[in-house]
Regions:
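Solvent-exposed, flexible loop/coil segments flanking beta-strands in beta-rich domains
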Residues: 1-39
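C-terminal interaction-tip segments
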Residues: 1-8, 112-131
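Solvent-exposed loop and beta-edge segments used for protein-protein assembly and interaction
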Residues: 4-6, 41-46, 101-103, 117
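Beta-rich globular "head" domains
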Residues: 28-65
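Residue-level recognition of well-ordered beta-strand positions that form the cores
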Residues: 51-53, 110, 126
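Short, surface-exposed beta-strand/strand-loop-strand elements in extracellular ectodomains
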Residues: 56-80
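An anionic, turn-rich surface loop/hairpin at beta-sheet edges
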Residues: 73-95
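Noncatalytic modules at the cell exterior or secretory-pathway interfaces
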Residues: 92-121
Length: 131
């Protein structure tokens, strides 16, 4: 769910309850982002802040990961376990990969296949938009 979006940033929320099989869910779809005032399309997202909760299970499987989508194998941005808040704005955010391979530049929420059924994952993330 997009909570707020403008030319500079987008804030996205996702709530995922595991069914025990693992999942990859598109979290930040750059092709669905609004164009800026000059008509340019968003090409990449830079993680600025994240609020998260990865709870439930026996403790060994209650984690999630944000990845940048790539046909050659997804590129991890950050791992999330427990609950908390991180602010990366002081140094410009966690930049995603912008190499010349087959990046699609979408950001995915990945829940491991070892997750117990009913584990809950909530992530609210603020991204800077790059054009």
């Amino acid at each position: 769910t997009i909570m707020q979006e403008n030319d500079v940033r987008v804030v996205i929320k996702i709530v995922n309850q595991s069914d025990g099989t693992g999942a990859t869910t598109v979290f930040g779809d750059v092709s669905a982002m609004a164009n800026n005032a000059n008509g340019a399309s968003c090409l990449h997202l830079v993680l600025q802040r994240v609020w998260y909760s990865a709870q439930g299970g026996d403790g060994g499987d209650s984690y999630a990961r944000l990845d940048e989508e790539d046909d050659d194998g997804d590129i991890p941005i950050i791992g999330l376990t427990g609950s908390g808040y991180w602010d990366f704005r002081e140094f410009g955010g966690l930049k995603t990969d912008k190499s010349n391979n087959t990046n699609q530049s979408d950001v995915n929420l990945v829940v491991p296949s070892t997750a117990d059924a009913a584990n809950m994952y909530t992530v609210i993330a603020e991204f800077k938009k790059l054009y």
